[in-house]
Amino acid sequence: MRVISNIASLRDVRRSWQADSKVIAFVPTMGNLHQGHLNLVKEAKLKADIVVVSIFVNPLQFGPDEDLEAYPRTLENDRNVLSEMGVDVLFTPQVKDIYSRGLEQQTFVEVPGISYMICGASRPGHFRGVATIVCKLFNMVQPNMAFFGEKDFQQLQVIKAMVTDLSMNLTVHGVKTTRETDGLAMSSRNQYLNVEQRALAPTLYTRLQEMQQKIESGRRDFSRITSECCEQLAEAGFSIDYIEIRSADTLLQPGHEETNVVILAAAFLGRTRLIDNLQVSLA
């Protein structure tokens, strides 16, 4: 595996792949890799000749009171794991190379509408930061396809919309959420949880499953179903950011003809923000 931190060097390698008509898959990450990330890599390896993984903790997607400085950085271990998996290139750019004119002078990519709702309402500017860095990385790597986890469902929809709107020549694949044995969605931030919080954390997924069962049983009183879940989670010790039932296609409020919805959730245990989602068919 080659480790490349220079954009020009990456482009040189990319040209050689292009000359050989290689199919290139890309997995962008912020590092501190867990099995969820590795499953993205596995999917990429199944579909492409070349797999590129990036590790870049993107300051543009963190709010002023969020965990940019505390975010776990485990580059040496990540490098070893990716090498063992047979990744072709690990791209590790620096902030000064990605944002050469500084964060304030940076050209931004913003996907209107979908970026401002749900998680975007709780974290203003977050999806602008995500769309900007992903667009820049796509321009650098120029992959044929890219892989993202469905755990970050709204992020996945933002990226798909950006790719469509900007006529980018690549396919975006969503990969099923990877969970711990007790159901907790894997996340690099789970390590912030203390012992008591970690024991409680899977309750979020359990409550979403109960919402799913209520909908599948025929209930369509989505507001009441959501309120019931919020009450149960609050009683258990969670601080609710949002629990929403939205169209899986548009993330808008479900219409009468909706066939697929997604339950989206974000809640805090202490200072740790957990997110999860479940898709539900109404057919």
Swiss-Prot record:
(R)-pantoate binds at Q61, Q155. InterPro entries: Cyt_trans-like (IPR004821), Pantoate_ligase (IPR003721), Pantoate_ligase_C (IPR042176), Rossmann-like_a/b/a_fold (IPR014729). Keywords: ATP-binding, Cytoplasm, Ligase, Nucleotide-binding, Pantothenate biosynthesis. Pfam families: Pantoate_ligase. Disulfide bonds: none annotated. Transmembrane segments: none annotated. ATP binds at residues 30-37, 149-152, 186-189. Catalyzes the condensation of pantoate with beta-alanine in an ATP-dependent reaction via a pantoyl-adenylate intermediate. The reaction proceeds by a bi uni uni bi ping pong mechanism. Homodimer. This is Pantothenate synthetase. It comes from Pseudoalteromonas atlantica (strain T6c / ATCC BAA-1087).
